[in-house]
């Protein structure tokens, strides 16, 4: 189609570019005249492409079209006019001229907010839904028939800039292109605008952007954000006009400490605090503004209002002087109307506009090795000298957010360079433990030290809890929209996937996990877990509940599902990353902050995870990782008054101690995933080949270091001998070796103390009369390797029949053919109830057994088949509470009932 593009701005330019990509012929571009010698982006692009560009200062005089302007337009013979953003009045002779007429982009859901300040009014009136309309132009003001509309959620702290950049700009470009496509195909609708809900809102200008303080805080917040950045909501303090930017609304809660600032007309003094300027409405609620701009254009952080001028000017190095001159040249290119850029030259007073801010930020990024400034930084340093000082401080790392500094341990292993953090991770930074205390973490494959790891002390634990508490109560995490929190968790999962091979390699050398298993399960399921729970972030919701009415009044009761606060998580060594993911993903999804203690013997993937969390944009203090002794860290977290929840996976005796400490300290919420002795019942009518294969997996998976491992196999007598024979044959085929070798089936046990316990466990089994059919001893090679082991003739009173080995030890007992209730009684005769399994082709038998088994998980004709969507957790002394699935969220949420009478 032959199209005339009429408009201006970056938005107009992007629509123009996309129309060319679609194959349309742009016959002409009509834009505004150059300003201070600078062409509008739309016109500049079209001129480069050789498209005819017209820069009429006006199309009409005294309400009448200028004939020569109209003739120049008509000569192009356009079939459609596209007006992506146009500040000029276009005569109807031009609007109606093309075959298909004209379409216009408008940034509101028409008929609401007609007029030139639609985005401002969407926010000022507190609309929950925003969006844009592409409509057919007519002789009214934004009254033409609707072609298409797109909606978006308006976030509580959205400003004109944020909603524009997040949705109205990118989706608006797509919407304009789609509208043209529909017209070209002959499918474009014409829907009459409804009269109901129609509004026309006047244009927002500086003179009518003065704040009215006699209204609720939320209305003041909406007014400020609705005028952010243009024209800027303002008030007068000490005979000086102050303009406010970056408002956030805080409902309820005590006001923070701060220095009072009297504001004429306000219900109470504002407070200058470390987080910004706290303002109050006439309802006593509060809002906080981040930045203040003075009449001369200078912007400062609101928290700095009472502070003295910046410290003495920096002395620039020779290299920094070169950067300064390059930036001076960039200012000169932007401010073409200024003959010389002096140190005192003010960017905005010299004629710069908001579009020039974007350009300057990009120029600095190009000249300063990717240094990323924000638009606000330009407003806060408007004079050239101030701007250079700010840029140099950023380049030196003296200003802005603290840079993440990591003292990596680097290893050339598994055909890659592995970079491993080894310090405590507290409040978004890696740091040494108090006193520089550390310990060696050991590679179980050969018994050598991988690296020194910081050993957390009491003061470190308290510092981490304080950081988590601050992040929860005052940080961005607690204010964040749940959907935005989900985006961060998705990003974290993506980064874990990008580093999957590195994480799996670290897991292999630190825990002994076979690399191929680490890729699929240890790391792969961790990624799946974060993705699954990221999707839950914006789906946590309460209920409305019918209650008896207090007649003649009425009542409404609803529930809120709220995060608990600071959560302590203590995880075991068998799946170091996966156990972190199972608990932490649900915890973060619910909106909590976390202090996590990895197992002392396997801390490295947790620390690598901490690094990735920073790169994903998780705010500081939300995640804290403390390697060290469980007796110190776990106990302190259980006792700490600011920790409100403990999630623990580990042994039953330690779980009991944690539960006791949580009760005595502050009655913390607790979830426990403890020991197991999971029974696997195999009936004679099973698929024996599958039962042998899955039976081996149930015991030897991950070297037996598996909380749900089948701790005891009950075999129906008629298949006992054949089953044992086949299992022994298959075990002999298993390759024991280096976990990084892709052909290895069975790697080393996790650590030396565990290996010694396995040796002792098997010696006890032999002493009590168990028949050691295979294995039972350490492999004669360096490292902590233990042979896959098989015991038969194990009777119910034996130690190995009751206690879990947590290793590759298969315990086999017989039961009489057909004695279903008898074997169920034996299987349930345990204080544990984590998992269980049954193999049979008889569906009635399978359902009966699954009903009667006293375990949190029952596998039928399979084993180890866990999934991120299925709840996981035990009965009896295997603990309580669930990991995974929707139920896991309950462990990290509290329910509040709210009853209203009206």
UniProtKB/Swiss-Prot annotation:
Region (Hydrolase domain): 1-310
EC number: 1.5.1.6
CDD domains assigned to the protein according to its UniProt record, in alphabetical order: ALDH_F1L_FTFDH, FDH_Hydrolase_C, FMT_core_FDH_N
Binding of NADP(+), residues: 571-573, 597-600, 630-635, 650-651, 673-674, 757, 804-806
Active site: 106 (proton donor), 673 (proton acceptor), 707 (proton donor)
Role played: Cytosolic 10-formyltetrahydrofolate dehydrogenase that catalyzes the NADP(+)-dependent conversion of 10-formyltetrahydrofolate to tetrahydrofolate and carbon dioxide. May also have an NADP(+)-dependent aldehyde dehydrogenase activity towards formaldehyde, acetaldehyde, propionaldehyde, and benzaldehyde.
Family: In the N-terminal section; belongs to the GART family. In the C-terminal section; belongs to the aldehyde dehydrogenase family. ALDH1L subfamily.
Protein name, per record: Cytosolic 10-formyltetrahydrofolate dehydrogenase
Encoding gene (name): aldh1l1
């Amino acid at each position: 189609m032959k199209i005339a593009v009429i408009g201006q701005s970056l938005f107009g330019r992007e629509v123009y570019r996309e129309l060319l990509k679609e194959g349309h012929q742009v016959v002409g571009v009509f834009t505004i005249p150059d300003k201070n010698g600078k062409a509008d982006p739309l016109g500049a692009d079209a001129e480069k492409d050789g498209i005819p560009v017209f820069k009429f200062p006006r199309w009409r005089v005294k309400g009448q079209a200028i004939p020569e302007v109209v003739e120049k337009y008509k000569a192009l013979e356009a079939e459609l006019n596209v007006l992506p953003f146009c500040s000029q009045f276009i005569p109807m002779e031009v609007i109606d001229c093309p075959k298909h007429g004209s379409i216009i982009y408008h940034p509101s859901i028409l008929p609401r907010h007609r007029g030139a300040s639609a985005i401002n009014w969407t926010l000022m009136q507190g609309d929950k839904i925003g969006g844009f309309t592409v409509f057919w132009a007519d002789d009214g003001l934004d009254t033409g028939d609707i072609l298409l509309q797109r909606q978006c959620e308006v976030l509580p702290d959205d400003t004109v800039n944020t909603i524009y950049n997040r949705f109205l700009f990118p989706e608006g470009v797509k919407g304009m292109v789609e509208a043209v496509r529909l017209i070209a195909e002959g499918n474009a609708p014409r829907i009459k605008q409804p009269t109901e809900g129609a509004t026309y809102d006047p244009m927002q200008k500086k003179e009518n952007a003065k704040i009215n303080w006699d209204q609720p805080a939320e209305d003041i917040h909406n007014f400020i954000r609705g005028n952010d950045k243009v024209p800027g909501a303002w008030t007068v303090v000490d005979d000086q006009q102050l303009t406010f930017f970056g408002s956030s609304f805080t409902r309820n809660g005590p006001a923070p400490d701060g220095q009072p600032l009297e504001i004429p007309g306000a219900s109470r003094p504002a407070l200058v605090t470390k987080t910004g300027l706290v303002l109050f409405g006439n309802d006593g609620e509060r809002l906080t503004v981040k930045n203040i701009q003075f009449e001369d254009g200078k912007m400062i952080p609101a928290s700095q209002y009472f502070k003295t001028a910046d410290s003495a000017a920096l002395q620039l190095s020779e290299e920094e002087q070169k950067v300064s001159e390059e930036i001076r040249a960039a200012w000169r290119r932007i401010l073409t109307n200024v003959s010389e850029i002096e140190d005192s030259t003010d960017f905005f007073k010299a004629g710069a506009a908001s579009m020039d801010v974007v350009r300057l930020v990009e120029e600095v990024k190009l000249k300063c090795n990717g240094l990323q400034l924000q638009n606000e930084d330009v407003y806060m340093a408007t004079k050239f000298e101030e701007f250079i000082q700010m840029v140099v401080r950023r380049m030196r790392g003296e200003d802005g957010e603290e840079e993440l500094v990591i003292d990596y341990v680097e290893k050339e292993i598994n055909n890659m360079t592995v970079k491993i953090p080894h310090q405590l991770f507290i409040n978004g930074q890696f740091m040494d433990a108090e006193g520089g205390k550390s310990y060696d973490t050991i590679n179980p494959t050969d018994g050598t030290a991988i690296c020194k790891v910081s050993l957390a002390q009491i003061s470190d634990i308290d510092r981490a809890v304080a950081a988590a508490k601050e992040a929860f109560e005052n940080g961005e995490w607690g204010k964040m929209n749940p959907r935005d929190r989900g985006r961060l968790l998705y990003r974290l999962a993506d980064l874990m996937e990008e580093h999957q091979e590195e994480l799996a390699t670290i897991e292999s050398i630190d825990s002994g996990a076979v690399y191929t298993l680490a890729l699929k399960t240890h790391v792969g399921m961790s990624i799946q877990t974060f993705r699954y729970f990221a999707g839950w972030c914006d789906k946590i919701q309460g209920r409305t509940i019918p209650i008896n009415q207090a007649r003649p009044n009425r009542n409404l009761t609803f529930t809120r599902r709220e995060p608990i606060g600071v959560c302590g998580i203590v995880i075991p060594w068998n799946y170091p990353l996966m156990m972190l993911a199972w608990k932490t993903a649900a915890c973060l999804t619910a909106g909590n902050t976390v202090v996590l203690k990895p197992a002392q013997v396997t801390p490295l993937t947790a620390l690598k995870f901490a690094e990735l969390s920073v790169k994903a944009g998780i705010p500081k203090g939300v995640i804290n990782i403390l390697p060290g002794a469980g007796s110190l860290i776990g106990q302190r977290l259980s006792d700490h008054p600011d920790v409100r929840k403990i999630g623990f996976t580990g042994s039953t005796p330690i779980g009991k101690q944690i539960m006791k400490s949580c009760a005595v300290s502050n009655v913390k919420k607790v979830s426990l995933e403890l020991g197991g002795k999971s029974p696997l019942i195999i009936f004679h009518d099973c698929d024996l080949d599958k039962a042998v294969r899955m039976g081996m997996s149930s015991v030897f998976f991950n070297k037996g270091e598996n909380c749900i491992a089948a701790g005891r196999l009950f075999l129906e007598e008629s298949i006992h001998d054949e089953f044992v024979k086949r299992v022994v044959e298959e075990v002999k085929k298993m390759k024991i070796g280096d976990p990084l070798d892709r052909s290895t089936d069975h790697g080393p046990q996790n650590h030396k103390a565990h290996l010694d316990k396995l040796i002792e466990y098997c010696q006890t089994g032999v002493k009590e009369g168990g028949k050691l059919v295979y294995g039972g001893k350490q492999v004669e090679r360096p490292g902590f390797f233990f042979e896959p082991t098989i015991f038969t003739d194990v009777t119910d009173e034996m130690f190995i029949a009751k206690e879990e080995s947590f290793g590759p030890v298969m315990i086999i007992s017989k039961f009489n053919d057909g004695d279903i209730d008898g074997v169920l009684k034996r299987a349930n005769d345990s204080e544990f109830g984590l998992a269980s399994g049954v193999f049979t082709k008889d569906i009635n038998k399978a359902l009966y057994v699954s009903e009667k088994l006293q375990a949190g998980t029952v596998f039928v004709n399979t084993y180890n088949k866990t999934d991120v969507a299925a709840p996981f957790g035990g009965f009896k002394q295997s603990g309580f509470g669930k990991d995974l699935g929707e139920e896991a969220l309950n462990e990290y949420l509290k329910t509040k009932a709210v009853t209203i009478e009206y």
